[in-house]
Amino acid sequence: IQLDQNGEFLGYFGYNNNPITAWEYLQDLLFTDEMKAQLFSRVPYSFGNVDIDTKGILYSVTQSAEGNAIKKHDVAGLNLLTPNMEDEQDFVDVCIGTDGQIYAVTATGLIFEYDMDGHLLFTFGGRAIAVEQNGVFATASAIASDSQGRLYVLDGERGLVHVMAPSNYAKAVHTAMREYSLGHYAVSYELWNDIISIGGASYF
């Protein structure tokens, strides 16, 4: 829902598709209007959470969506992210980093980091199985980031917030991505070569 600065309703923005199955298509062809009225309504999945980046672009996450669980909406509400991005069906929240990277967390505590176009960079976190351990969760329910690149992940079941700081490797990846997005291709190239020589995939 879009509201102006005075709280007046402007309209709706963004949406989830509601794909029709082959069976539903046959129902549309063969059933009468009265028969269709007796069926469950075809309501698309609702957005579970949203975030807005520094440029005012809206991001949404949809739980139980069949693909495109994360959306980056343009001014018309269309999704700007790659349609083939790797995602999960139990995402519960999304947040945007200072360089446009997208973070999403599942209910089981698995955290995904994507670049600004939706390409997967890192996965980390996970579910705590009968242990008290930092960085894993009983039930993750929210995620946020700050200007230093730290992540704050709420474990709703335990009632605590985990604070995660990026490793030197993750910082190097973010710097290389930032230089590339600014058009500093030669600098980015050298940074990526250094990253490849370091290896590793640890976030925190």
Model regions: which residues?
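Eukaryotic scaffold repeat domains enriched in small/polar residues
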Residues: 1-199
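TPR/TPR-like alpha-solenoid helical repeat scaffolds
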Residues: 202-204
